[in-house]
Amino acid sequence: MAQVEYKGTGRRKNSVARVRLVPGEGNITVNERDVRDYLPFESLILDLNQPFDVTETKGNYDVLVNVHGGGFTGQAQAIRHGIARALLEADPEYRGSLKRAGLLTRDPRMKERKKPGLKKARRSPQFSKR
């Protein structure tokens, strides 16, 4: 028998997370490692569990994630975005609560590019009067 599986793709900064939700006990696996081994801070783990808290589905699904690019925070938020999209695929009635919590919106903020003649995106070289 084919197993029921809900998929969602989440993005944040340079991170892309491919998320699969499978009915289970609430285990989260990121890149074939437990989420507590993969993410260094408890706050990030709480952050990516937010879609389950909003929809009151904590412990109903096992989460399998493949994520690459960016740092820990960007990856955690990409996973959160992917989980929200996968939950929406599982039950379209979650749309209202997920939308109100802002979990379906892709955060558009990206790193600003470095400009020529400047040290960073906006930081100019030190000015010397003489």
UniProtKB/Swiss-Prot annotation:
Pfam families: Ribosomal_S9 (PF00380). GO terms for cellular component: cytosolic small ribosomal subunit. One of its GO terms (molecular function) is structural constituent of ribosome. Residues 98-130 are annotated as: Disordered. Residues 111-130 have a biased composition (Basic residues). Gene3D superfamilies: 3.30.230.10. It comes from the Bacteria. Keywords: Ribonucleoprotein, Ribosomal protein. GO terms for biological process: translation. SUPFAM superfamilies: Ribosomal protein S5 domain 2-like. Belongs to the universal ribosomal protein uS9 family. NCBIfam families: PRK00132.1 (NF001099). This is Small ribosomal subunit protein uS9. It comes from Staphylococcus epidermidis (strain ATCC 35984 / DSM 28319 / BCRC 17069 / CCUG 31568 / BM 3577 / RP62A).
